[in-house]
Amino acid sequence: MIDVSGKIRAWGRWLLVGAAATLPSLISLAGGAATASAFSRPGLPVEYLQVPSEAMGRSIKVQFQNGGNGSPAVYLLDGLRAQDDYNGWDINTSAFEWYYQSGLSVVMPVGGQSSFYSDWYSPACGKAGCTTYKWETFLTSELPKWLSANRSVKSTGSAVVGLSMAGSSALILAAYHPDQFIYAGSLSALMDSSQGIEPQLIGLAMGDAGGYKAADMWGPPNDPAWQRNDPILQAGKLVANNTHLWVYCGNGTPSELGGTNVPAEFLENFVHGSNLKFQDAYNGAGGHNAVFNLNADGTHSWEYWGAQLNAMKPDLQNTLMAVPRSG
């Protein structure tokens, strides 16, 4: 008699092995070629700040556009392959132009490749050497204090938005820092980062993107840090905080926006299921303060993330009570 269940399990193992082997290269291909130029047009009041970080032992470059004295901020976080010259939101979208005179200060930290914008256990050692990653401390303590003191930006009642790697980071930052971030946007994120083989896949992707090790970040897969940084497991915190959420993930099918390539299609389809699970967890915890866009066509590419950032602008302005500027 044929052991059908055994064959299914074997095929499942092979599929997982195949996914683990190909995921890093797919992420690399979907991310596109690096560029040294920014999108923002000349004339926009974009500043290039150097913000001191005691936690990281160096100054961090931050691209910044002021929304006015006392304005709330929108922190835009980059993907796994974040560069050290410009934030990906400026390289790949016209975010500064879209949000010009919106009443929202736009804050784009630069760098943090493979960081998950987290406080790492150990030095972040990769192909370029070792550095200190204490991004959560920087984003939730050092940077808001500096912006408040030096640019009159509100240190509370703000928003954090991220794509891919940083989508889950945005939710986690809002879960643990609810006074600062009353709004969190997650675009095409992996939402079950501590479950199954996800820690191994994340480690492989981080190794491909800079030679980093996931164990230096959150320890072995059974370490509590993995659960702390898992959006599905922290959905209840977001509900308890009444954080306003904007959660997007395409289904892996390209639309007229583009992003028609196998890596981008595969990756979006790969993370889509975890977004549905997050929605279930959020609803199951009694959540009622979220926008979920999970049914539309879309791939793992900037065309869709830019469209979402543009679409959420009125929602951000309303939630953060921004006062648009004129002139």
From Swiss-Prot:
Protein name: Diacylglycerol acyltransferase/mycolyltransferase Ag85B
Catalytic machinery residues: 164, 268, 300
First-listed, main subcellular location of the protein, grouped into a coarse class: secreted
SUPFAM superfamilies noted in UniProt: alpha/beta-Hydrolases
Region annotation (Fibronectin-binding) ranges: 96-106
The enzyme's E.C. designation: 2.3.1.122, 2.3.1.20
Species the sequence originates in: Mycobacterium leprae (strain TN)
InterPro entries listed in its UniProt record: AB_hydrolase_fold, Esterase-like, Mycobacterial_A85_antigen
Gene: fbpB
Homology family: Belongs to the mycobacterial A85 antigen family.
Chain positions recorded as substrate binding sites: 80-81, 164, 192, 270-273, 277, 300-302
GO cellular component: a single term: extracellular region
Keywords for the protein's UniProt record, in alphabetical order: Acyltransferase, Disulfide bond, Secreted, Signal, Transferase
Coiled-coil segments on the chain, per record: none
Signal peptide segment: 1-38
Function: The antigen 85 proteins (FbpA, FbpB, FbpC) are responsible for the high affinity of mycobacteria for fibronectin, a large adhesive glycoprotein, which facilitates the attachment of M.tuberculosis to murine alveolar macrophages (AMs). They also help to maintain the integrity of the cell wall by catalyzing the transfer of mycolic acids to cell wall arabinogalactan and through the synthesis of alpha,alpha-trehalose dimycolate (TDM, cord factor).
Catalyzed reactions: 2 alpha,alpha'-trehalose 6-mycolate = alpha,alpha'-trehalose 6,6'-bismycolate + alpha,alpha-trehalose; an acyl-CoA + a 1,2-diacyl-sn-glycerol = a triacyl-sn-glycerol + CoA
Lineage of origin: Bacteria, Bacillati, Actinomycetota, Actinomycetes, Mycobacteriales
Cysteine disulfide partners in this protein: 125-130
Cell location: Secreted
GO molecular function: diacylglycerol O-acyltransferase activity; trehalose O-mycolyltransferase activity
